[in-house]
Amino acid sequence: MSLEKDEEVVIFEAYLAGSANIFKNLIELLSQVAPIKKSDNSNKSIKQAFFKITKNGIYINIDHQSDILINISLDADKFGSYKYNFSLPELHIGITLDIIKDALKNVKKSEGVALCIRKKTFQTMPNEMSFSISSMDNNNASRGFVVKFNIVQNININAMLDGQELIEMRSNQFLGLCKDMGGSKKQIKVIVHNDSVVFSCNMVDIATKWLSFPIEEEVFQSSIHEKLYFLNHFKSEHIKTITKLATFDDTIKMSCVDDSIVFKSYITRCTPTKARHLPTEYIGKINIWVKAEPKKEISDDEDDL
């Protein structure tokens, strides 16, 4: 008996319990920094994220030309169930963020999320992913949506260097820094010199606020015979983007490489600040690179801090 034309095969499915809010926060972060582009199929302006799906996990990033680069990795072995069964070792897809962001805006921490990609037997490549949100309440009622995607080529997920980790700070410390120095159209100066990392901001041209973090001892000792120096200016709204990392873990690590600063965080299923009676479970990692503003003439007193 021949197969029906509309028969489907599952090529990818994954389920993560109690983590729908993690996907919500990830999509909100990606949507916040993704560049706006014209759709290939219409004149609409869209924001898009790129997913690389393999047997080892899900890897997500945005356009490499953005001023803020984001790489996210979700480990397959941290999912409650995870199966990838496709002829290609990697499936590269582009998904419109606005649709997913709107669909996930009301999810709860206790809800789980299931992802699924099916391919019709007559298709060479799939073109849809389904999201299902389930809860232990309401008699196990579930809801979901299906979003179309496009196949993309040559996703450079790990194109950037990480740099050497300099400091580890509490997420609430960084939230406080951004609150003190935030505001649109401001610049934050970041200096790495000797044994400290200093963030400073000019306040209405009449004062300067600064916050200093000591460089981790082992890093300082290993580079004591080298010139450890970095000075660049960054848009305050770009730095403020990093505050979203506080929703994933209690600590943020920072490093610098070339003209960028890199922020790293684990993605936890249950953040310690909200449920200290449960053990912290890491399900992935997130790296954010923030590019510096173009270099300008440095005055004689630029290094005062």
Curated annotation (Swiss-Prot):
**Family annotation (InterPro entries):** DNA_clamp_sf (IPR046938)
Instruction: Output the superkingdom of the source species.
Output: Viruses
Q: Which family does it belong to?
A: Belongs to the IIV-6 436R family.
Record-given protein name: Uncharacterized protein 436R
| Source organism of the structure | Invertebrate iridescent virus 6
